[in-house]
A protein has these predicted regions:
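N-terminal prepro-regions of secreted/extracellular proteins
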Residues: 1-70
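Mature secreted bioactive peptide module from preproproteins
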Residues: 48-153
Length: 153
């Protein structure tokens, strides 16, 4: 889930639940947020005695913010790795994040990535300040899950 907390200059709350591979949320100030899920199989490792394929699945969920001119302001990426025994189990084995700020009026805090079962979670907060006053806040709260077939969502 992605939540943008409005400031005095914003007109409404925007809550985003990722359902597709790529989504775009347009903000009332002309900026927009893009959320993209990227996935790939790393390798087919083995077959178990029940002939279930065992493989590693890697996924990234990238959240970017651009201003109304299309200039990149910031980016947050959740990286996740899953071990999948096809049709049997999926386990998140690694969860990390990265963030990059491109516009100097934004800052980042409270970043973290965790894993539990078949899901990776990423959180963090971007804030934009003008004359030392916070005018925009973007709270990142996203996840990547893997099913027993290696499908990421």
């Amino acid at each position: 889930m992605f939540t943008l907390t409005p400031s005095a200059f914003a007109a409404r709350d925007i809550e985003f639940v990722h359902k597709n591979k790529t989504e775009i949320v347009y903000l009332n100030n002309g900026s927009y947020i893009t959320i993209t899920l990227i996935s790939k199989d790393i390798s087919t490792l083995s077959l178990t005695s029940t002939d279930s394929a065992t493989f590693t699945k890697v996924g990234n969920k990238v959240v970017t913010c651009r201003d109304k001119k299309g200039n990149l302001e910031w980016e947050y990426t959740l990286f996740a790795e899953f071990s999948v025994v096809e049709n049997v189990s999926a386990t998140c084995t690694s969860a990390t994040y990265s963030q990059t700020i491109y516009a100097s009026d934004w800052s980042f805090s409270n970043g973290n990535a965790t894993k539990s079962g078949n899901t990776a979670y990423g959180v963090g907060t971007f804030k934009r300040k003008v004359l030392f006053v916070t005018v925009d806040t973007a709270n990142i709260d996203i996840s990547i899950s893997c099913d027993v077939y290696g499908n990421l969502s």
